[in-house]
């Protein structure tokens, strides 16, 4: 097939063997199930309650047994052939003789949940029904083992336990309905059990000896109700496991899969124990990142008194077997910290272990977290008694801190003098300190930059000793002279304009392309891209800077679309948990586990495999750009979109995202890494200002993007909706040109998120190449004519868009 012909051809050409489609194929669904099992985390297993012995009789409690949540809402939703809930998964195990089920209970829940669905409820947003006492009595007579399933749903555009306090802020009608519905179901917010769930749990505990809990959730939830509860000896964090998540959970509880997932977030005793909770809902117009770099375990392992608030530490996860990790050696070699270790399976079952290497930098003048993850490695499946040697390494410069106030060297990464210590283990809390240290006699500047994207309204930030330091404030950046700002209502939800230029037919346009400048000449080496762009009229270049109409099964619009110049219309598609195609198209794709679960595998190779499989589905359906991965940090459990993001730790997020991008782009379709950056709150996300220090910005919130840019070369980056220190992210030249391109040498294209509140020509000037889902050509043209933007600035963005298109096959 010739260059770009796939983008013109409908229906699709199958990419599978023997003319079969790969989209939603049995092979991809099996991979989804495998990944789900790999990422589930066993957080409690007293008395070896799990796995269930063969033939165990089981009673299934909780509407979550039926009301399974495969993933979050919004861009993360996926149209699939089927969704396997936990009851269906356990029935498959029963058919194989592994367990025996008391069916009347799930049948009761099935009837109730169907009634709630019929009344308009969606998975995860249903009410826990009261179980009839006679059913409990019959179940108790049948068995002493019960499994409770708790489920949660969240989605794009709204946060958990959302509170709107600011006068003058008006909710959209769908936002209002979602918030009201959530409040009516989750009396204390969905971080905690509902009253109905709590009553059900108490009833089960009172009647059954062995109580197991399966948590079908997308992010952090309350764990205090089961952590020290003797009546609940086993708990599996099953997350949102995609279309086969219910069967994958059954695989784990029956022992067909030995859990090897590890937590990628810290689970504190209460929601109030997270430093971000205090001001998360303080205002809809801004969020102060006062905790600074002390996010997640960096806070709980460092700040005095915080460690005791942790129920389950970052990196924690149990197995049905046991492992012994021995450090064989540690050294600094060629600018890298290198640690060699051996892992031996000392138990009776085959299993996998994750070796985690942390470092602790000297406090110095800047202050540092007590521990920071430097590297990690997951073993292969080790048989009983088998040993594997692993090597973990990272550069010495990775331990540098950014000095944003000039305490050591202004706007520089510095390694402060002193001893750097190291820890190896299978979670941050239990990692053992090594005898080896890296000693630095003098402070060293590893990279010198300039101040970019600095805060103006952030008044204070947390220090390592638990106190706060005051930060300089001012009135904020002064906006350059330009056109009067558009009314925000004109920036909401408009479709790309379809212009019938002199009513020319497509054939006429193709004929024109034979004599016009043609992008195919660049493909064939007849002219350079610069030469091609120089020949295009300014109006054509401006046209390229906005989204284009959908073709085929696409519903998130295209890029390019100048056939008279040989430029194809490259389609985009959501989303993070699988290729998202509207149900009316009749195309079922594969729903992968949510990003948090994938991160919990601690297995970049597996994530890359999923990226490749997902990329095949995207390509087969004539889509060019897949709007994933999303790598924002789990700053707070309250963010409604955490299921779509990987972790509280930027290294895990970056390594996971880079693996996904490599897999996707091996199929020559483009990744769009999002949301750049600090999109850690959904409420008023288009106008909320994230106030964050330069240090926290670089060390925490930009770091995952930096890793992906340097390790995976993504075709595109998606700028976020929010403001960052008073400047719209899509108009933020400091970020898009200064850091992304100037410091990291990013060569790809930047797109806005869909229907941002940024002014199109200002976004272009900042280095945001294309405005999605539609551009405002007349505004850019007016700004050009009035001298507020130059042809060179327009052409630079157009060239980056065309470079991206040239990378497609």
Regions found by a protein language model. Name each.
Residues 430-449:
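Short beta-strand elements
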Residues 1-430, 451-809:
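Glycoside hydrolase catalytic-domain context in secreted enzymes
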